[in-house]
Amino acid sequence: MYSAFNAGVNAFTRSLAVELGRDGVRVNAIAPDLADTLQTPADAMLRGRDPGMVRHWLPLGRFGQPDDYADVVVFLASDLSRFVTGVVVPVDGGTTAASGWYLRTDGRGWTNLPDQP
């Protein structure tokens, strides 16, 4: 269900951008990932794992903060993005770029097993 919803948001964003572009309306979306918030606290996401592992799981080494997402929204709503429409911006600390690969705990390369050195 989650994947279907995401695909729907992506398609809807592109479709609206095409439909409304001629009227000067830009339509974009963000795709947030792991965020340390009151609704999804880091402790709950860690589920008892060592907090130091976060630097291995996420290329930027930390969970997102609300301001990380808000700043992208402000950019998309500003004239700085006046030629940007129909895109979904991943705000994910690099998890999309890593595609499921994690820095090994010994620092010697990458693994697809996040808890293994």
Which functions belong to the PLM regions below?
Residues M1:
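Rossmann-fold NAD(P)H-dependent dehydrogenase/reductase core
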Residues A29, G48-L80, V84, V91-G93, ...:
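C-terminal helical subdomain
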Residues N28, P32-L38, V87, G94:
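Proline-glycine-enriched beta-turn/loop adjacent to the NAD(P) cofactor-binding site
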Residues F5, T13:
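Active-site helix of classical SDR
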Residues V25:
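Short phosphate-binding/catalytic loops that engage adenosine nucleotides
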Residues R22, L34-L58, A98-P117:
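A glycine/serine/threonine-rich, flexible loop-to-helix segment
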Residues V18-R22, R82:
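Alpha-helical segment proximal to the catalytic Tyr-Lys
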